Amino acid sequence: MFRKLTLYLFLLLASIGLTYDTQSYTSGALSGSAYGIIGLSTLIALCYILPGIFLVRYLGKRWQVKPLVLIFALIGGVFITGWIAGYANTISHDWVTAHLSSKSFFYRFEDALMAPLVEEPLKLAAFLFAIYMVPTKSYKELLLVAITAGLGFQISEDRKSVV
């Protein structure tokens, strides 16, 4: 029962993330030249995305990792961690600017310090969800699932920087 509830929560968060990530493309607010720039930038990003996915697929076959766990990790990394990290970074930035003086060390380096504190636990959550839904035991499998969740987050982050 708890596994089904977790799966439904994952699907809900992934649906929200898919809507959040594609909203700027589907709203019709961009000009034709902006869509052209987005298309060209996407083609450039595919130069590392496709080899990365093929490498994960190759290592998954070689190390006998269940493909479903890699799919969960990739979807979690792409559609869940990205939009939550965006909101969490905004909230943490607002908190730091409201509660700390501009002379404090943490205030000055907030951009460099808060992003890892917010984003890394979210990548860990995508990893933990994937291995909870499809249990894996060997260290090679766990490493590949973690790499896949990180690759998914990187894809999401690069797609957001284009728009």
Language model segments and positions:
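Hydrophobic alpha-helical segments at protein termini of multi-pass membrane proteins
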Residues: 1-163
